[in-house]
Structure formats: structure tokens, C-alpha cells
């Protein structure tokens, strides 16, 4: 995960810079006698420092390439003419054969061949038509059950994490590579608080269970605890964002800067944390509160996770054992349990229920980086990986998963709803899919040229009790999105 802000913008600027300095060559159909004129035309306006001999050699090579393409084009035209002639001849011969008397063997052979062709044609047509009907039905159903409600736009770089407060008023928090964390009004999409205390990418954000305090992890090798006070604005009527099936077209190259105003420029700013946790020697990739909110855990690229006392900022435990960088950490909602994920293809369960000793269990089952592992209500852990799978584990039987979900793209920071235990999967390929704990696919969030994410989706977060939006997603297209998932209808379609 990049630690410097502007990483996506820098990549775009570099790409544009390379494009502006690329050699411009005009397409022309010219003979050998026209080559000097062609050379002059191609070199017009070019501020080249190459010697004349080198330029002439390059132009001659380009000329040879052009001639080869011309020859291929002519050969292609000739082949097309021959194919058309053969098709016409076959049509005439087929009509003549149909009018002639055939022997029993010939008739059997022809009938078998014709039947096979007809069967194959019908099969292909039926399969394509059925696929379109099913795809259209699924799209319509998903759109009715999963509706986009609000876009949260204001960051200047990609978003790594999204979270919802557990206290009133309920607000949305986002962590971005632009070195800031923002708090948003869920109803209006207005930025309420801007935190600028970090000197690196803000990689995660989590809220205190009982107070208006946030915990953020950063690429500056620290985690910050900071207080916020928000007053919600009056919600305004929102326009209908639903689209018809005919408009469900993927314009994936649409620039993420389109309509991208600086919504955070006029919101109150918090610059100094209450405390900073500074024991790591590498990027702090994630952080979370232990139950009760008196301790916090952090995960770092230095291959360790640290447990801190929030009041004193003192390091209580350093959790070692992972062989590679950590990618995520998560705490149990009601027990003193922590799960850490790593690039070493494992995740580990740390038990702090006994103050005198903490135990650790290693979960092995993935073949690539474990991007996140989260607790569910009960005795389950759900893990997601770059190996394109999600696995559901029973804490009482850690040898093998009880369910495996196989997908077509790497999975990032997953979220499991509390009530119905629905797993939300954010993908590298810009999709967000919903599954149940048995691995049954429930829905795919709609995505088109008018709505949805246009870049990698990094994180999902459920907020089931909110009346407007009960699922949030964020991605590297610099925006967070609030969705309304009709959970009863979703489960009824199961």
C-alpha cells in the first residue's frame, strides 16, 4: 500500500508527460520517391537532438514498417475476396445437391452433417440469448435491491479505509493517501471535520466505541488518537440516481477528476492529536480499538503488531511472529481477541482474555497475501486474500475453513454485517459483491458509467442501523459511496 500522498496523481502526470514527448508520426501512403518529403513532414515541429544520420535511419525503418503493413492489408483484402467467392460457390453447390437424387449413404452423411450444424447453431444462439436474459434479470434485481444513495467526494488521492462511528451523531470517516482523514455527514455528503495531523498516507480509521475519538494509522510510522466534535447539517433532498438498463454501460476510462470539487476546503480542521503511538519502525497499515476502548492495537510493515494503553500511550505488548509485512488488524466486538493479517499468506489470532498470558493461533489456507481478516458475531473469522478467495473459519476448529468463496479478482478489506452476517467483498476489479456465510452469492452492487467505483475498491463497511445508507465502500477513485441494501429482499432472492 503506498505511503506517499499523490501517488495516483503522480502516476497520471508521469503518464501524460511521456505521452506529450512521444514521437508523432503521420500516416501516409507514399512511394519511395516521396520519402524525402515524408521525412521533412515528419520532422516538422520536432525539436530532436538526434544526429541527422540516426534520424534518417529511424525514418527508413518506419517506412519499412509502413510498407509491411500495407502488404498485409492488401493480402487481407485478397483473402476476403477469396472467402466471399468460396462462400458463393458453396451456396450454389448446396442448392444443386438439394435438387439431385442422393444415395442412401450420401443422404445419411449430409443429414447428419446438417443436423450437427443446426444443433450447434441453435445451441450457441440459445446459450447467448439465455445468458443475456439471465444477465439482464440479475442486473435489474441487483439494482432494485442495492441502490446508490450518496457519493462522498473531496479527497485529493485514493481512499484506503472507510468506517462509521459507533456513537451519536453517526458520521462517516474516510482515510486517504492525501495525508488526511475526513468525517462526513451521511445524509448530505458534506465534509464535517478534516484531520491533517499525519505526515504520510492515512491508511485506516476506526472510531472509539463510546466517545467522539478517532484512531488513524499512517505511513509516517505512527498511529494518532484525536478528538472530534461534529454538528450535523440539515439534510437536503437528493436527486434520483437510478438508471435504466439501457444505460448500464461501463465507461471505465472516465476521469476520476470529473466533477471533483474540494469539498473539504471549508470544513473545520483538526491539526494536533490527543496522543501519538510511535513504537513502529515501518508503515502503520491499520489500527483498531480493543473492546472497552482503553487499549488499541496497530499493525505495521515492520512485521509486528503493537498493543498500547490509550491513556498513557505506553506499549503493552509487541506481537511478533509474522514472516512478512502486516496488512490489517481487527478486534473482536465483545472479547479481548485480535486477528492480524499478513503478506506471509497467514493470519493470526491473539487472545488477551487472560491478563497474565496471551496465546496465538496461526491460520493457514491462503496462497497469497491475506488482505484482511475480520470477526463475526459468534465464533467465526472471515478472511480475504489476493489469491481471489474468501474463507470462513470456525475458531473452535482452525485446521480448515468451513466455507470457501472463489472470485475472479483480488479481495481487499472485507466487512461482515452484524445482523444477517452478509459478507461484503471489495475487489481490485472495481466490483463489490455480497455473499452469505455459506458462500452463496447474493448480489453485485451496480456499476456503470454514471454510478459506482471507477478504480480499485479498497474497503467496505456495514452500518445496518442507519435508515439511509447501510453499506459504505471506498476506492482509489478518490470517493466513498453510500449504498442502501434491502436486506430482507436480498435474502428472499437467495
From Swiss-Prot:
Record's signal peptide: none
Bias (Acidic residues): 245-263
Keyword Cytoplasm: yes
WD repeats: 154-194, 197-236, 279-318, 321-360, 365-403, 406-445, 452-493
Region annotation Disordered: where it falls in the sequence: 1-38, 236-266
Disulfide bonds: none
Major place of residence: cytoplasm
UniProt keyword annotations, A-Z: Cytoplasm, Nucleus, Repeat, WD repeat
Superkingdom in the source lineage: Eukaryota
Biased composition (Polar residues): 22-31
InterPro entries: G-protein_beta_WD-40_rep, WD40/YVTN_repeat-like_dom_sf, WD40_repeat_CS, WD40_repeat_dom_sf, WD40_rpt
KW 4Fe-4S (keyword) present: no
One GO CC term on file: cytoplasm
Location of the protein in the cell: Cytoplasm; Nucleus
Protein name: WD repeat-containing protein 37
Organism per entry: Xenopus tropicalis (Western clawed frog)
The encoding gene: wdr37
